[in-house]
Amino acid sequence: TQRSRDVANQLSSGIKHLLKKNKVTVFDGFGYLDKKTTEVKKVIVRLKNNTKTLELTAKNIIIATGARSRNLPFVSSDAINIWDYKTAMTPPKLPSSLVIIGSGAIGMEFASFYNDLGVNVTVVEALNTILPNEDEDISQVVASNFKKRGIIIKTNTLLKSVTNKT
């Protein structure tokens, strides 16, 4: 576990060095693409310290979104068998089965990973397709591949509650 954190920190430092070396300006904040602009790529960035908002234009723009788990209103904060992505990366022990809520890129990556380790995986998605931010044909190919591997996919499924199993 500590080794994986050390490697991640080393890679992160290396990327920062390469960006600086190649004179890439990095803005730490919250950004979104301006949908009104079609010819020029424009991004609006609110800096992390909330001091100001910038409008940036560039030929090439990279938005590194990062990842953060979302609190779900129907999940008890004292639930002991509910993991966020950090726990899923370094589980206390390998479960025999796992339900993954959400089929975005991170959820599907965990589904594949745990399936490869022999865990029975079910993915639950509220929308009608997995990987809802991707092209439909990509979603269909991934769904077909995952089903062949034994991953259960439940789309159009809304969770109402999650409880601890004792």
What positions do the PLM features span?
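Glycine-rich active-site loop/strand segments that organize a redox cofactor
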Residues: T1-R3
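Rossmann-like dinucleotide-binding cores of NAD(P)H-dependent redox enzymes
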Residues: D6-S12, K16, M89-T90, P95-V99, ...
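FAD-binding core/adjacent interface of flavoenzyme oxidoreductases
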Residues: N9-I101, L158
